């Protein structure tokens, strides 16, 4: 029997509105190949995504800025102009021609934006962040703590970007809530030291992310929406002392707010941004199992990413109901390794 016939990784699964033929997902990968001035995806992006599409497979796009002011990184595509929407439509058409599905990852940088690119670097709180600690040559940004008016405006950006995604032919969206970017900055005390209704207790720190989630779900339907989290990552100055004390309640809050959500996408503890430590000795509480248990009690699907190989993905899928997202293996093309997708 073939690998495809003998492993759960290649069994069909319904994720929100889409009926997938297997559980192998393209993880969002920052490519930085868009036009530097217009943030329009490059013409060859359609070929890039089509190469990674498969019949009944799910791709999650590179992070895509929801508005110009949400950016602050060069050559990253946007989804806030008609020119950008038209360019993305050629990409989604190419994926659909291969029988695949594609979700757009909606992205806002927050305090890690480059101040040379955007006039205001927005932040959840006033906790200093030194970009040089991540290997960047940029000095620490002078950022602006978001007011309630700013927060409401950004919620509107997310909502409009979700609508633009559907216009561009995407099958859904993933809200980027991981890796120390804006939504993650509200969730964690490493960056959120606010004393108003958006800071302090978990309920307050969840307020902005939930507003975004609810606005996006209202705009395009919860079965077209996923959200990403990275509970254990130290990337960009993040990580709570007790990550699960934040992210288990966060998963519960997500599912309570949107029980028909398509998926929650979590990053494994061995990953921090673009770096991984496959042989790292994990602490006892460094485990996605408690979050998986929360998600497993609902209709929401659970996607995991971080350092998987074809062999470990097959073993993981056999033990769980998870979908497994690959990044670097998709760059090298899984099909070159005889993966049956």
Name what the model sees in each region.
Residues 1-341:
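Flavin-dependent oxidoreductase catalytic cores
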């Amino acid at each position: 029997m073939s690998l495809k016939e003998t492993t759960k990784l290649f069994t069909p699964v319904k994720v929100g509105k889409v009926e997938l033929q297997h559980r192998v997902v393209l993880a969002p990968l920052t490519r930085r190949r868009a036009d530097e001035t217009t943030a329009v995806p490059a013409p060859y992006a359609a070929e890039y995504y089509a190469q990674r599409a498969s019949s009944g497979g799910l791709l999650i796009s590179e992070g895509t800025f929801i508005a110009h002011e949400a950016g602050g990184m060069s050559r990253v595509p946007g989804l806030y102009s008609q020119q950008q929407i038209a360019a993305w439509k050629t990409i989604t058409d190419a994926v659909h021609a291969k029988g695949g599905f594609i979700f757009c990852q909606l992205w806002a940088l927050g305090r890690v934006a480059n101040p040379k690119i955007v006039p205001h670097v927005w932040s959840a709180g006033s906790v200093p962040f030194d970009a040089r600690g991540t290997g960047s040559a940029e000095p620490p940004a002078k950022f602006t703590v978001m007011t309630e008016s700013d927060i409401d405006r950004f919620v509107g950006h997310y909502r409009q970007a979700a609508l633009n995604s559907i216009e561009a032919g995407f099958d859904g969206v993933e809200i980027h809530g991981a890796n120390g970017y804006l939504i993650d900055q509200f969730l964690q005390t490493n960056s959120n030291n606010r004393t108003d209704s958006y800071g302090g207790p978990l309920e307050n720190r969840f307020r902005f992310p939930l507003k975004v989630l609810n606005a996006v779900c209202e705009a395009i339907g919860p079965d077209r929406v996923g959200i990403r989290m990275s509970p254990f990552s130290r990337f960009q100055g993040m990580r709570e002392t007790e990550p699960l004390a934040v992210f288990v309640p966060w998963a519960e809050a997500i599912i309570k707010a949107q029980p028909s959500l398509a998926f929650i996408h979590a990053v494994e503890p061995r990953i921090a941004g673009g770096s991984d430590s496959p042989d790292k000795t994990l602490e006892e509480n460094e485990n996605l199992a408690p979050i998986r248990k929360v998600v497993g009690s609902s209709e929401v699907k659970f996607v995991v990413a971080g350092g998987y190989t074809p062999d470990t993905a097959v073993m993981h899928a056999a033990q769980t109901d998870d979908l497994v997202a690959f990044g670097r293996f998709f760059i090298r093309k899984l099909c070159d390794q005889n993966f049956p997708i």
